[in-house]
């Protein structure tokens, strides 16, 4: 018997027949003579709008049972942990969860500004013995093919899964068993969410790990007569961004104007709702550091929550429930120091709280948390101490090093002996001059 994904029925337990929940589809006389190696292959399917790519890319003339996985970050590998990767579907037992993900290289299109934009690839799943590589054995090294199987599946035999008829069977949204680690930089079509980060895992040499790509999006949701291409949504989004003067592939640059807008937007929020970042620093949000606000120093004051070390500290932050029910709260009315005196005065209250966050050395990242806390608690005291240190004496211009006590004497205008006020002994000439000054003045009437 063969299994049909997405169809529920009673299961039959037998050593010769695989059990499952799918509707049993018994093969007719012509199907029974089909060779095992060719099971699941179409002879030559009719090309439709959903299987043709007008501007480059490889054609996928086979219909997958599941929606695709799309790459949205360049340079990310498409890979799964050993024993994971096959999507789940009602009616298919774990023993049939084996096959491969096929990379569909999509083409490029012209944007409104005349540039060619390459669409990132997409991956689609095919059961073992079906799809474009139905003849290939499990584990064969093929570019654009990534083999996956559950731990209960026998990879030496093809999966007993019927082909999908897009006119009667819709594509099933891709879902995985709990605990599956999805590739980083990819998202499941139709889910609207990016896939969780993947763990790096060693693969056997028979499993080829290739660059991520994607196949046709929701191929089963479109009939063969549909004129809508699977990449039309991406093209429309890119055209809209091009009209707005934005490039979806380039990160948006933050200018002084946008930084000012971001800062003002943050400052317009209540104090307890602000999140400091590069555009709005900790001091701008909450004021200078001091005894009452004693956390933060160095780069963390500049970057705020954008600091790479902040996320691990955020794990210690209490929840709203812990804040209200695990703290000592006190409501106090305070003086309104802000606002225009001409405007009606508002009553201002403070909800003061006192609590504690308890953790021990078994906490994940304990050493890093302690390091960050020690670096930022009361860091303002060290900064204030550095600012209060006496500045290094600067050498005046026009002097050479090593002049010592003469460095404080100006050389622009030399001082006279009177200005210098230097003491010296009187000479005989000085004494004679002083005596003449003491004699009475007499007018000289002698003729020349």
From Swiss-Prot:
The modification Phosphothreonine is found at residues 174, 427. Residues 1-55, 158-231, 266-293, 385-448 are annotated as: Disordered. The modification Phosphoserine is found at residues 167, 191, 390, 423. Disulfide bonds: none annotated. Residues 266-276 have a biased composition (Basic residues). Residues 29-38, 45-55 have a biased composition (Polar residues). Residues 266-384 are annotated as: Dimerization. Residues 61-190 form the CoV N NTD domain. Residues 259-384 form the CoV N CTD domain. ADP-ribosylated. The ADP-ribosylation is retained in the virion during infection. Phosphorylated on serine and threonine residues. GO terms for cellular component: host cell endoplasmic reticulum-Golgi intermediate compartment; host cell Golgi apparatus; ribonucleoprotein complex; viral nucleocapsid. It is found in: Virion; Host endoplasmic reticulum-Golgi intermediate compartment; Host Golgi apparatus. Packages the positive strand viral genome RNA into a helical ribonucleocapsid (RNP) and plays a fundamental role during virion assembly through its interactions with the viral genome and membrane protein M. Plays an important role in enhancing the efficiency of subgenomic viral RNA transcription as well as viral replication. Attenuates the stress granules formation by reducing host G3BP1 access to host mRNAs under stress conditions. Homooligomer. Both monomeric and oligomeric forms interact with RNA. Interacts with protein M. Interacts with NSP3; this interaction serves to tether the genome to the newly translated replicase-transcriptase complex at a very early stage of infection. This is Nucleoprotein.
